[in-house]
């Protein structure tokens, strides 16, 4: 910088360099010029804009540590930042809080707040929830990318036993990984259907046989088919347990508990039958066996493992507990009120079917849920009027929470598709940058397999700094710095 420009700066210790509350601070953020005043900025002295008040006394080093450029003639500070985000950030000086405008990326906005040194506590609660939701999405994308990278990478330091476990786990848990894995997944799906159909067919009297003691039991052919299915389910569960990287988490997960409930009744029934025969307590044992056989219906839930739609529906119902609780509360109040009214109004009829209020609960339930079996019905005019009102109230009560539940389902389904697309997009960009760094104009995904092993794990940078390590618009905060260098990504400035 020339001498004339240096001389145009206020001298340290001069009157001009002393910050006052009436000083004007002119900032140019992304081409948008803004005039701010010292008394306004001094409310939050720890922010970057407030530091501009006293920076002139520190010379060029201090000035350029705070801004990208400075015009001594105009006393104008230049910042190469997002002007839209800046307009939101300076609201803290006027209103004491910050609102993130629609259309601004939450993660970029957080970076802007960090740059201007405005604490996140000034961000409004509604905007914090949006930022938290976006952060969860990024963590999910990072988790998916990390899993795919782990599957693609081969660590030569791992033993043969560990590599074998990873291959078995990938074979059983990721049907899309290979053609044989798809075949096994389809076979498992078909066996679930076959075992469910066999369970139902075993209750048909024409397909049952009489044993030596005169009891009707399932046909031996159906029992053999069920035994074969149970053998497959058992082998599949044991292999997945054997290859699981975290066996405790595997055993306690919901879907694996369903798998255990699907195969456990078979072995418990078999054990109780043999023990009962020895102890001559066949009556009690048979009752226990029949009770356990009912648990076989749990195997139908195994279909959720092969159906993303069922998994989405389960998640939507879990997220709709509040709406479902309101529905049950409305129905419970309505059942109590209308059953009591129905019992009271029907007492004048000599052939009334409403013997008591608890017995009337059944009538209120089937009326409010629009089932109407017809086993209990009102016979008086007031009773019929009460039935009509209870019917209408039931329709309204059931319809109210349906829309939020559908919204939760659609939102989660769309979110899963977006996350899946974002993860694939990030991997494609990683591969593209890796191929470009190697001087290959068109590398293939198999190039990732030849990457050097990942360095020893160490504590990575903070969440905010990890965001800047990604080169694309899809930030993946959980990927470590070594992983990014491993794929030769360019830092996002």
UniProtKB/Swiss-Prot annotation:
A motif (Selectivity filter) lies at residues 370-375. Residues 434-468 are annotated as: Disordered. The keyword ATP-binding does not apply. InterPro entries: Ion_trans_dom, K_chnl_volt-dep_Kv, K_chnl_volt-dep_Kv5/Kv9, KCNF1-like_BTB_POZ, SKP1/BTB/POZ_sf, T1-type_BTB, VG_K_chnl, Volt_channel_dom_sf. Residues 358-378 dip into the membrane without crossing it. The keyword Transmembrane applies. It is found in: Cell membrane. Keywords: Cell membrane, Ion channel, Ion transport, Membrane, Potassium, Potassium channel, Potassium transport, Transmembrane, Transmembrane helix, Transport, Voltage-gated channel. It comes from the Eukaryota. Residues 1-183, 245-249, 311-324, 407-493 are cytoplasmic. Its main location: membrane. The chain crosses the membrane at residues 184-204, 224-244, 250-270, 290-310, 325-345, 386-406. It holds the Pfam family Ion_trans. One of its GO terms (biological process) is regulation of potassium ion transport. Belongs to the potassium channel family. F (TC 1.A.1.2) subfamily. Kv5.1/KCNF1 sub-subfamily. PANTHER family: POTASSIUM VOLTAGE-GATED CHANNEL SUBFAMILY F MEMBER 1, VOLTAGE-GATED POTASSIUM CHANNEL. Heterotetramer with KCNB1 or KCNB2. Regulatory alpha-subunit of the voltage-gated potassium (Kv) channel which, when coassembled with KCNB1 or KCNB2, can modulate their expression and their gating kinetics by acting on deactivation upon repolarization and inactivation during maintained depolarization. Accelerates inactivation but has relatively little effect on deactivation. Coexpression with KCNB1 or KCNB2 markedly slows inactivation. This is Voltage-gated potassium channel regulatory subunit KCNF1. It comes from Mus musculus (Mouse). The gene is Kcnf1.
């Amino acid at each position: 910088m020339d001498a004339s420009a240096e001389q145009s700066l206020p001298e340290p210790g001069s009157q001009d360099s002393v910050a006052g509350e009436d000083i004007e601070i002119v900032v140019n953020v992304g081409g948008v010029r803004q005039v701010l005043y010292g008394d306004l900025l001094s409310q939050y002295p720890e922010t970057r804009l407030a530091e501009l008040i006293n920076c002139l006394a520190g010379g060029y080093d201090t000035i350029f540590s705070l801004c990208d450029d400075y015009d001594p003639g105009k006393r104008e500070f230049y910042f190469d930042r997002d002007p839209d985000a800046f307009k939101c950030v300076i609201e803290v000086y006027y209103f004491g809080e910050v609102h993130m405008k629609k259309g601004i990326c939450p993660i970029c906005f957080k970076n802007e707040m960090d740059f201007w040194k405005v604490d996140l506590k000034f961000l409004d609660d509604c905007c914090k929830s949006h930022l938290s939701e976006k952060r969860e999405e990024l963590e999910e994308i990072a988790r998916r990318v990390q899993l795919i990278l782990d599957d693609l990478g081969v660590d030569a330091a791992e033993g043969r036993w560990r590599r074998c476990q990873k291959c078995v786990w990938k074979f059983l848990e990721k049907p899309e990984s290979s053609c044989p894995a798809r075949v096994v997944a389809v076979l498992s799906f078909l066996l679930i259907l076959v075992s469910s159909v066999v369970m139902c067919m075993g209750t048909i009297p024409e397909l049952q046989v009489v044993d030596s003691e005169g009891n009707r039991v399932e046909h031996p052919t159906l029992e053999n088919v069920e035994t074969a299915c149970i053998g497959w389910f058992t082998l599949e569960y044991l292999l997945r347990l054997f290859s699981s990287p975290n066996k405790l988490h595997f055993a306690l997960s919901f879907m694996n508990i369903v798998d255990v409930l699907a195969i456990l009744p078979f072995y418990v029934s078999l054990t109780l039958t043999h023990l009962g025969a020895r102890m001559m307590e066949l009556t009690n044992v048979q009752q226990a066996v029949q009770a356990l056989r009912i648990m076989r219906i749990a195997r139908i839930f195994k279909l959720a493992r092969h159906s993303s739609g069922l998994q989405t529906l389960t998640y939507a119902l879990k997220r709709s507990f509040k709406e479902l609780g309101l529905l049950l509360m409305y129905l419970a109040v309505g059942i109590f009120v209308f059953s009591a009214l129905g019992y009271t109004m029907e007492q004048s009829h000599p052939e009334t079917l409403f013997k008591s209020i608890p017995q009337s609960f059944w009538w209120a339930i089937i009326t409010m849920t629009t089932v109407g079996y017809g086993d209990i019905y009102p016979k008086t005019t007031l009773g019929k009027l009460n039935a009509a009102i209870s019917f209408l109230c039931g329709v309204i009560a059931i319809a109210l929470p349906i829309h939020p539940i559908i919204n939760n389902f659609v939102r989660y389904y769309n979110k899963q598709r977006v996350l899946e697309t974002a993860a694939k997009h990030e991997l494609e960009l990683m591969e593209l940058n890796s191929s470009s760094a190697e001087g290959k104009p068109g590398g293939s995904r198999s190039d990732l397999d030849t990457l050097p092993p990942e360095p020893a794990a160490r504590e990575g940078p903070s969440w905010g700094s990890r965001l800047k390590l990604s080169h694309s618009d899809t930030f993946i905060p959980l990927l470590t710095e070594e992983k990014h260098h491993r794929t030769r990504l360019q830092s996002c400035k």
